[in-house]
Amino acid sequence: MKFSFVSLFPNLMEFYFKDSILARAKEKKLFKLNFYNPRDFSKNSYHKVDDYKIGGGAGLLIQAEPMYEVLRSIQEKKENPYFIFLNPSGKTFNQKDAKRLSKKEHIVFVCGRYEGIDERVLEIFANEVFSIGDFILTGGELPALVMCDAILRNVNGVLGNMESLEEESFENNLFEAPAFSKPFIFEKKNKKFYTPSEFLKGNHARIASLKTTLASCKTKFFRPDLFLEHERKK
């Protein structure tokens, strides 16, 4: 699988893939990375890519020409690029999208800055437009990294234990059950906090049943909307 990032600040993203699970997956050649800077495709001597909006309005906009050129150059490599634009007006990214997109050959994340990208570029290239929530960020780089991370976790071999993926939150519209580590009794300020005793008895069937119950309770408490969706699909 291949990921390309189109950004005015590619250095902000490269570091993310240098440690931990994704670094190991990259070393195993489970995915490839490319970074493109629209400034390199600007036709003016100052590599300027932004200008004021036609019709007025605050802030600067990334112009159509350099964005068109960089995306067209990616298209011409004929690596089945799937263009994803990051925009607050896009649909909210979720775990189902992460699973679906993990089957793509080549995802291109197009990251905006300033007041965004000339709308005509989206009309020409966008396969999908995503947001990661109802809030505004300085640019599309963080949402692109969030999505890339979530997608890669669904690529075979990236996680050392596929069972970890199956047990993660949002599977079957439920959060992952609460997790506990040693010590079995955690004591602070004269208060004792216990691990559920059933977890210590070694009966795997009963532990699995308790985890399902706890996952349901956790989801119902924190995200009743997800819990209702889970109940509806039973």
UniProtKB/Swiss-Prot annotation:
GO terms for cellular component: cytosol. The keyword Oxidoreductase does not apply. Its EC number is 2.1.1.228. It catalyses: guanosine(37) in tRNA + S-adenosyl-L-methionine = N(1)-methylguanosine(37) in tRNA + S-adenosyl-L-homocysteine + H(+). S-adenosyl-L-methionine binds at residues 112, 132-137. Pfam families: tRNA_m1G_MT. Coiled coil: none annotated. PANTHER family: TRNA (GUANINE-N(1)-)-METHYLTRANSFERASE. Homodimer. Belongs to the RNA methyltransferase TrmD family. Specifically methylates guanosine-37 in various tRNAs. This is tRNA (guanine-N(1)-)-methyltransferase. It comes from Campylobacter jejuni subsp. doylei (strain ATCC BAA-1458 / RM4099 / 269.97).
